């Protein structure tokens, strides 16, 4: 195993590669979320006219997927490596395949397939054309061209590449269980994450206080609305993320019915859309500072 990339070396390799392609290297956003797409570095920056190229690792929590550390491939928390490029480069798929080569995976020697899988996130009002990337029969990446984010049409189109780091590392290191992945020399994934995985699963399915979570959802929703009323986009979005994670905990606990579930998702979606619209308005007031001068003048002159 010593001659194979460790988990952290995979991250470092991807960071260096996408840095070379002009991406800013961001840090994981400090709020619970179910996917890297929900980070403000993707959700907010994918809308509006300004360019944005970023890459970051995002720990992603999905309470309903917890399995007490007993399932070798299904986790309460996993890690995504997220790349967002706006406008989408015409050669984004080629860039992706080159990133696999950097990891020691030669596309000419492996069965790499792009399987159509259009993406939708009802709770944030987001959707796009998408493909799963399968490497020798195992999904390792999700490719998406955003068409709508927060209920707003995207222009220009943002390309998102989401690597599933645990799956990628399992393949590279040739192990059957994520807990056998070598995170760093001499340190296994399970030695870091197995106990937290068990504890979070037990909490999500058995211990969480449903009444408290229901109350928290109401509080977070009202606080998001209050922040938005003051034009405070980023604090409001933090509370949208808190609403989303709280709902996921309630869902894992079986505390919401099918009908109630749709209602909660609609409430989160309403907040996310309000945040998206307010964010674009905020950037416009600032004069879309990330645009080049000619584009900014032309765009603002249209209004």
Swiss-Prot record:
One of its GO terms (cellular component) is cytosol. It comes from the Bacteria. CDD domains: GlyRS_alpha_core (cd00733). Keywords: Aminoacyl-tRNA synthetase, ATP-binding, Cytoplasm, Ligase, Nucleotide-binding, Protein biosynthesis. It catalyses: tRNA(Gly) + glycine + ATP = glycyl-tRNA(Gly) + AMP + diphosphate. It is an enzyme of class 6 (ligase). It is found in: Cytoplasm. Gene3D superfamilies: Bira Bifunctional Protein, Domain 2 (3.30.930.10), Class II aaRS and biotin synthetases, domain 2 (1.20.58.180). GO terms for biological process: glycyl-tRNA aminoacylation. The keyword Cytoplasm applies. Belongs to the class-II aminoacyl-tRNA synthetase family. Tetramer of two alpha and two beta subunits. This is Glycine--tRNA ligase alpha subunit.
